[in-house]
Amino acid sequence: MRVLIATDAWRPQINGVVRSLERMVEAAPEFGVTPHMLTPEGFWQVGLPSYPDIRIALATRRHVARRIAEFGPDHIHIATEGPIGWLTRAICLAQKHTFTTSYHTRFPQYVAARWPIPESWSYRFLRRFHGPAAGVMVSTATVEAELRAHGFERILRWGRGVDLSLFHPRPESVLDLPRPIFLSVGRVAVEKNLEAFLSLRLPGSKVVVGDGPARADLQRAFPEAHFLGAREGEDLAAIYASSDVFVFPSLTDTFGIVLLEAAASGLPVAAFPVQGPSDVFAGSEAAVLHEDLRSAALSALRLPREAGLQLAQRHSWHSSAEQFYGHMRRAMQTAAAGKAARVEPAPASTALSVRLEPAEGKEFA
């Protein structure tokens, strides 16, 4: 099965969407899948207003169609609702090609945190985007319930995983700071609610790993905190294992892969009792979820570190990829069955056919 994944979120961005898609690409051969990423890479790009580190593609439908046709996918998955996502969606609809989508971000809440735009407007925008999809993949039951309450249909569950070979307890600390060390990892942006963590009266040290548009302002406002910038791989894993409590102040995440990474590292978690943490830690003793984040952080110091390890072992990227590609195969089978029922001529290939036009002048590639 040849699968094209269209996404506006890709390297050099570091976030849960990119990490999830990278893991799906890595696991693809295990499921007989040949993946291809359609990303902003290769197109002219511009920084997103209020978030210049995120680059969006200045692409045209013709040039996106050319990229799709060159690969010849059996199935298309659209991961994001940006320019790449909308153009790919338009091509799929024009060619009557089955596609799936995924819902990674609580877009209405993110928009409302930055601009005075009613959430109802954002949900209307999202329903239009995801409505024609054969299935909309979401990470948790809570996200599924939220979308159903706003009129979404054909919702599919797609869980997330953690790399236990990378994220695990380590005997030596790489952080020479007063203890206890309270750690937060993620994008440093207003929607992550980091100020709720940094303003807490806590003993020891506060450490923030990540980068983003709010970093400079937060560093000025909280000079006692340690901002380490973006970290990945062994460097990031060692920081997790060197800390004492992971504090997750976000109120808008759909899941939070960093929660699993912290748990796998033996790090107790403190968070608000909201969507994301409530789903990940349901029935687990690996976290303290409380409206008083300071109380949660201090209580988390007393949690058994083994609880997080037990939780993390139930989440593998292999099972995540099995769900991901399984949904696509079933979408293809359902579409094929529908065509057979209508007695339509069977195509020579399920690959997408796109009429190509010669480029005129300089193209966006």
Q: What do these predicted ranges mean?
A:
Residues R124-R170:
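Donor nucleotide-sugar binding/catalytic pocket of nucleotide-sugar-dependent glycosyltransferases
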Residues V174-V207:
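Conserved donor-binding/catalytic core segment of Leloir-type glycosyltransferases
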Residues L251:
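Aromatic "clamp/platform" in nucleotide-sugar-dependent glycosyltransferases that forms part
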Residues T98-T100, Q109-R128:
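Nucleotide-sugar donor phosphate/pyrophosphate-binding loop at the beta->alpha transition
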Residues H130, A230, A238-S243:
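Short alpha-helical donor nucleotide-sugar binding micro-motif in glycosyltransferases
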Residues R302-A337, A341-V343:
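A charged, aromatic-enriched C-terminal amphipathic alpha-helix characteristic of glycosyltransferases
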Residues P268-A271:
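Short hydrophobic beta-strand element within catalytic cores of glycosyltransferases
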Residues A216-E234:
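Nucleotide-activated donor-binding/catalytic signature segment of Leloir-type glycosyltransferases, i.e.
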